[in-house]
Amino acid sequence: MEELIRKANVLMEALPYIQRFNNKTIVIKYGGHAMVDGRLKHEFARDVVLLKYIGLNPVIVHGGGPQIGQVLKSMGKESRFVQGMRVTDQETMDVAEMVLGGKVNKEIVANINRHDGKAVGLSGKDGRLILARKLEMTAINPDTLTPEIVDVGLVGDVESINTEVITALENNGFIPVIAPIGAGLAGETYNINADIVAGRIAGALRAEKLILLTDVEGVKDKQGKLISTIDTQRVPDLINNGTITGGMIPKLNCCIDALDEGVHTAHIIDGRVEHACLLEIFTDRGVGTAVGRFTS
């Protein structure tokens, strides 16, 4: 009986959040360990279906870097990175589009549909969803110690998002699953960082939440303790004093950009935790790090 009461209390704790987020859009960047662990893939798909059934509108944007790397390796092609961006020639772009828009995207769609969801797979080329431009990058030349433009090939940045196809799918009960591939004005194809795509889509949709699934608990302080909430005003100081470093910097910048475009809150959470998205959305404590404007 105590176990049954505990389960009932969990449902009651979720009720105000279900009411608050009814018909709201939640953009989830799906990547990392949650995409490769069989049990976590299964649970993520079930969680997404649950979100839709109880009245939320989940939009999934997925990565797939390791899967691209595996295919390139099998072809005998070495992967090169500059500041975390894969150098993408035409052959690599063809592989990325095949892996992201084909294998990875359709596997996620199939997993969701297996649990009675109605997922539809898209890339940024579909419905002119993602208009992209070539990413301009600079790096410090080690000889001259001056910044220089670095050509990383067909790596893109988001120029604009066309939300029509997403809202049409949402309004008809479908769950969009989006591969981070964009199209340029001249029809060229670009590989885009999935965090950036998720943030820009969340902003364009004025989503209630942007959730980035990662392979860490969230943002940590210098003692390794999780920081549960970060006001955007604190981020520059946390970067300057070395608290936030490495790959967490672009993730936080992505969150801030999404907030600037109208997203209510952004969250960096541990995708290795079972039901991480549900715990973040429907519990008082949440999980991971919430990023927002919490001070006036």
UniProtKB/Swiss-Prot annotation:
At the top level, the lineage of the source is Bacteria
Site Transition state stabilizer — annotated at: K29, K251
Q: What's the main place this protein lives?
A: cytoplasm
Quickly give the catalysed reaction. Answer: N-acetyl-L-glutamate + ATP = N-acetyl-L-glutamyl 5-phosphate + ADP
Q: What terms describe the molecular function in GO for this protein? A: acetylglutamate kinase activity; ATP binding
Q: Name one GO biological process term.
A: arginine biosynthetic process via ornithine
Protein family membership: Belongs to the acetylglutamate kinase family. ArgB subfamily.
* Name recorded for this polypeptide: Acetylglutamate kinase
State the NCBIfam families in the record.
Answer: argB
> Binding positions for substrate?
G64, G65, R86, N191
- Tagged with keyword Acetylation: no
> What's the stated role of this polypeptide?
Catalyzes the ATP-dependent phosphorylation of N-acetyl-L-glutamate.
Q: Cellular location of this protein? A: Cytoplasm
Report whether Transferase shows up as a keyword of the record: yes
- What UniProt keywords apply to this chain's record, in alphabetical order? Amino-acid biosynthesis, Arginine biosynthesis, ATP-binding, Cytoplasm, Kinase, Nucleotide-binding, Transferase
A Pfam family that this protein carries is AA_kinase
What's a single GO CC term here? Answer: cytoplasm
- Its Enzyme Commission number(s) read 2.7.2.8
Q: Identify the metabolic or biological route this protein is part of.
A: Amino-acid biosynthesis; L-arginine biosynthesis; N(2)-acetyl-L-ornithine from L-glutamate: step 2/4
